[in-house]
A protein has these predicted regions:
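Peripheral (often C-terminal) accessory segments that flank ATP-dependent C-N-forming ligase machineries
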Residues: 1-93
């Protein structure tokens, strides 16, 4: 019986910020309000210095969404990820 009655899809989209010192993270509430979003995680706090993305540890967060299909879940996760904005100071050391 395990798994019976389950159908649909899920998707994770990682959040990649611009290079610079993190000033603020905005739009998390908007991202969480997207239909099908199960969670939004932000891994970094203001003051963190982002370099270019080289490894998974350089990511700033992630979004998990579900839907009736893999494509729907991915579209929802992408829409939520687009709502999250990382304000950075590109000139800070």
């Amino acid at each position: 019986m395990h798994g019976r009655g389950l159908a649909g899809g899920s998707a994770v989209v990682f959040l990649v910020p611009p290079v610079g010192t993190l000033v603020a993270v905005e739009g998390v509430d908007d991202a969480e309000a997207v239909e099908g979003v199960r969670w939004v995680r932000v891994y970094r706090r203001p003051g963190h210095v982002f370099g270019s993305l080289r490894t998974g540890a350089d990511r700033a967060g992630a979004v998990l969404a579900t839907g009736s299909s893999r494509d729907e879940a991915l579209e929802r996760a992408r829409r939520a990820a687009d709502a999250v904005r990382f304000r950075v100071d590109a000139d800070a050391p």
